Amino acid sequence: MPELPEVENVRRTLENLVTGKTIEDVIVTYPKIVKRPDDAEIFKEMLKGEKIENIKRRGKFLLLYVTNYVIVSHLRMEGKFLLHQEDEPIDKHTHVRFLFTDGTELHYKDVRKFGTMHLFKKGEEMNQMPLADLGPEPFDAEMTPQYLQERLQKTNRKIKVVLLDQRLLVGLGNIYVDEVLFRSQIHPEREASSLTVEEIERIYEATVTTLGEAVKRGGSTIRTYINSQGQIGSFQELLNVYGKKGEPCVTCGTILEKTVVGGRGTHYCPICQPRI
């Protein structure tokens, strides 16, 4: 699933491609992707004649701002936005097409069909689901070691499970939580309430630096991720633990292990990340 670095790179490339374009028509071939309104035909009619003004990101969500509305899109596992010419062949996994007045088309492709789209009037999007209960962005002023400390010390849940909770902090998924905990030298099954102030500060620093580096490297292409210009990321070349079960730790040489935490495959070093 695309996490913050991947979604941010989709946002940047997509914004460069479609800002200023006017929607002439919308074709939805898999209506279940459209969650709001509950009728894809209404979704289509509301967007006709709308001009794309800018594209923002909230956590793992893309927000496409048009003249009067906001399209809130979650890519889930395999979702992709790609720009095409009107005479190009249509991929069988293309489920939504935004046809522009200049003859180009924005295609939403999704092999797994897990992605979602919600349409809101401008100004309503942040106060309604799926955005209403999201925590702060990792790079926001609100996100500080003190913010994390206040919340982590109130829960006995395992730290990996807590960091995956988008109500605490947005943007982290399975890949980057494993990397953050390795850099922090924290075992993924530690209870959050057991962490010291110094350990929480390490988590904070690792979160900000890991995500920042990943954004600069275009994200991580583990399987099929590409941005809206069709480019892969390169941060996968810098991953220390994710997907590396059985390989030696880059720090101590110990063989990396994999377990399941909160139903998610989890990679770690048993020496660098001791379970105290």
UniProtKB/Swiss-Prot annotation:
Annotated cofactor note: Binds 1 zinc ion per subunit.
InterPro entries the record matches: DNA_glyclase/AP_lyase_DNA-bd (IPR015886), DNA_glyclase_Znf_dom_DNA_BS (IPR015887), Formamido-pyr_DNA_Glyclase (IPR020629), FPG_cat (IPR012319), MutM-like_N-ter (IPR035937), Ribosomal_uS13-like_H2TH (IPR010979), Znf_DNA_glyclase/AP_lyase (IPR000214), Znf_FPG/IleRS (IPR010663)
Superkingdom, natural source: Bacteria
Entry keyword set: DNA damage, DNA repair, DNA-binding, Glycosidase, Hydrolase, Lyase, Metal-binding, Multifunctional enzyme, Zinc, Zinc-finger
Catalytic residues (UniProt): P2, E3, K60, R264
Disulphide bond pairs: none
Binding site for DNA: H93, R112
Biological processes annotated in GO: base-excision repair
One Gene Ontology term of the molecular function aspect: DNA-(apurinic or apyrimidinic site) endonuclease activity
Residue ranges covered by zinc fingers (FPG-type): 240-274
Keyword Transmembrane among record annotations: no
Required cofactor(s): Zn(2+)
UniProt catalytic activity: Hydrolysis of DNA containing ring-opened 7-methylguanine residues, releasing 2,6-diamino-4-hydroxy-5-(N-methyl)formamidopyrimidine; 2'-deoxyribonucleotide-(2'-deoxyribose 5'-phosphate)-2'-deoxyribonucleotide-DNA = a 3'-end 2'-deoxyribonucleotide-(2,3-dehydro-2,3-deoxyribose 5'-phosphate)-DNA + a 5'-end 5'-phospho-2'-deoxyribonucleoside-DNA + H(+)
Entries under CDD domains matching the protein: EcFpg-like_N
Pfam family, one: H2TH
Cross-referenced Gene3D superfamilies: 1.10.8.50, MutM-like, N-terminal
EC annotation from Swiss-Prot or TrEMBL: 3.2.2.23, 4.2.99.18
Subunit details: Monomer.
Chain's role: Involved in base excision repair of DNA damaged by oxidation or by mutagenic agents. Acts as a DNA glycosylase that recognizes and removes damaged bases. Has a preference for oxidized purines, such as 7,8-dihydro-8-oxoguanine (8-oxoG). Has AP (apurinic/apyrimidinic) lyase activity and introduces nicks in the DNA strand. Cleaves the DNA backbone by beta-delta elimination to generate a single-strand break at the site of the removed base with both 3'- and 5'-phosphates.
PANTHER family: FORMAMIDOPYRIMIDINE-DNA GLYCOSYLASE
NCBIfam families xref list: fpg, PRK01103.1
Family: Belongs to the FPG family.
Protein name: Formamidopyrimidine-DNA glycosylase
Organism whose genome encodes this protein: Bacillus cereus (strain ATCC 14579 / DSM 31 / CCUG 7414 / JCM 2152 / NBRC 15305 / NCIMB 9373 / NCTC 2599 / NRRL B-3711)
